[in-house]
Swiss-Prot record:
InterPro entries membership: Kinase-like_dom_sf, MAP_kinase, MAP_kinase_CS, MAPK_p38-like, MAPK_Sty1/Hog1, Prot_kinase_dom, Protein_kinase_ATP_BS, Ser/Thr_kinase_AS
Active-site residues (renumbered): D144
Keyword Membrane: no
Catalytic function, reaction form: L-seryl-[protein] + ATP = O-phospho-L-seryl-[protein] + ADP + H(+); L-threonyl-[protein] + ATP = O-phospho-L-threonyl-[protein] + ADP + H(+)
Described purpose of this protein according to its UniProt entry: Proline-directed serine/threonine-protein kinase involved in a signal transduction pathway that is activated by changes in the osmolarity of the extracellular environment. Controls osmotic regulation of transcription of target genes.
Record-given protein name: Mitogen-activated protein kinase HOG1
Protein source organism: Eremothecium gossypii (strain ATCC 10895 / CBS 109.51 / FGSC 9923 / NRRL Y-1056) (Yeast)
């Protein structure tokens, strides 16, 4: 039976949350640089969910692309140890909302409240590495792995979240983004050349933090961060120094006094030998010598949980063709709408998700241009109509214009009548219009 949903508005920390009546009992759980996260109850399933509001996703091309990337990744990456996208919708205010499973807490909060017993430490590390094995097999680097991005429920099930900064496995990167405490040394030394090994380093830092209850490398700045890493690992080996491209970085590193490594058995005296061995293999200066997620899962330390028949890899590599695209906001908007329709299994007459990325861009660009022309024609018609009424209703005209400038369309995929680019870039798409006409909400079928 089809269920028609309606939007309602509420304020959370001064931020308007505009969601459908499918979701109730909103409570804030976290705030990030790009959005606010609230817990809620899915009234269809009676299950708790997390709703992440992406604020002003189309305010800039950079933010639009970032939102598009996160949605594409969430749709592609489906694994027990990764957060799962359950719903996505666009509000009349043009904000995008991701709905995912709700986990009880995150590892950062958990470590602040209590030390971890050995069995929990092992199980959490196992699940982190199990998730990373899958992510890396899909050709994806998380790039921002840290305790606050690791969610845990009351059953100790662990899920990695926040793929908004994830990138392709590419030897030429465009910058570094990971939180400093968990940042691999190659990012600081050769930030244009890194790969999936940066996630293994971050996981090693998290492993050590679970052991000690505090960050292993709490650097105050980049220089201090590198310094405290060398306090434990010693000076970087020649093979690593030879990869440094920046002349200033090379001068800095070679000017430092030589430091010998501290044996991990001495630094972590209360840790069992197999745990020390795995940690040491994860925190290696040279990324080429760092253990992989797959190999780490077979390490004796994780033997109680290792199951080679239940540690899957991705069915296909993630398609990163869009990653170097420099597109205008309107085109990203169309691409995003197409992805939302595809998630809801609603056909889009203008963009075929099975087409190549270039073909999708061409279709999206044409749709955006058609929308602009449609809006220009509408504005011209309104202008002509207003001119015809001039001299007839002088007093009423001012009121009419004021009302028209403030009136919002009832269609969430159509812009306002005050000259903005219309959001309905698929005006000829009957299915999309049917969705839009239901009080600014997609109609979702439930049996």
């Amino acid at each position: 039976m089809a269920s028609q949903e309606e939007f309602y508005r509420t304020q959370i920390f001064g931020t308007v949350f505009e969601i459908t009546n499918r979701y109730a009992d909103l409570n804030p759980v976290g705030m990030g640089a790009f959005g606010l996260v609230c817990s809620a109850v899915d009234t269809y399933t009676q299950q708790p969910v997390a709703i992440k509001k992406i604020m002003k996703p189309f305010s800039t091309a950079v933010l639009a692309k970032r939102t598009y990337r996160e949605l594409k990744l969430l749709k592609h990456l489906r694994h027990e140890n990764l957060i799962c996208l359950e719903d996505i919708f666009l509000s009349p205010l043009e904000d995008i909302y991701f709905v995912t499973e709700l986990q009880g807490t995150d590892l950062h909060r958990l470590l602040q409240t209590r030390p971890l017993e050995k069995q929990f430490l092992q199980y959490f590390l196992y699940q982190i590495l199990r998730g990373l094995k899958y992510v890396h097999s899909a050709g994806v680097i998380h790039r921002d792995l840290k305790p606050s991005n690791i969610l845990i429920n009351e059953n100790c099930d662990l899920k990695i979240c926040d793929f908004g900064l994830a990138r392709i496995q590419d030897p030429q990167m465009t910058g570094y983004v990971s939180t400093r405490y968990y940042r691999a040394p190659e990012i600081m030394l050769t930030w244009q050349k890194y790969n999936v090994e940066v996630d293994i380093w971050s996981a090693g830092c998290i492993f050590a933090e679970m052991i000690e209850g505090k960050p292993l490398f709490p650097g105050k700045d980049h220089v201090h961060q590198f310094s405290i890493i060398t306090d434990l690992l010693g000076s970087p080996p020649k093979d690593v120094i030879d990869t440094i491209c920046s002349e200033n970085t090379l001068k800095f590193v070679t000017s430092l006094p030589h430091r010998d490594p501290v044996p991990f058995t001495e630094r972590f005296k209360n840790l069992k030998p197999d745990a020390v061995d795995l940690l040491e293999k994860m925190l290696v200066f040279d990324p080429k010598k760092r253990i992989t997620a797959g190999d780490a899962l077979t390490h004796p330390y994780l033997a109680p949980y290792h199951d080679p028949t239940d540690e899957p890899v991705a069915d296909a590599k993630f398609d990163w063709n869009f990653n170097d695209a420099d597109l205008p906001v309107d085109t990203w908007r169309v691409m995003m709408y197409s992805e939302i329709l595809d998630f809801h299994q609603v056909p889009d007459s203008q963009i075929n998700p099975n087409d190549t990325f270039d073909d999708q861009v061409a279709a999206a660009t044409a749709a955006a241009e058609a929308a602009r022309q449609q809006q220009q024609q509408k504005q011209q018609q309104q202008k002509q109509q207003q001119q015809r009424h001039q001299g007839v209703e002088h007093g009423a005209q001012h009121v009419q214009l004021q009302h028209g400038a403030k009136q919002l369309s009832a269609d969430p995929l159509v812009g306002d009548s005050n000259g903005g680019i219309p959001l309905n870039v698929s005006a000829a798409n009957e299915t999309l219009n049917n969705f839009a006409n239901q009080a600014a909400q997609y109609a979702t079928d439930f049996e």
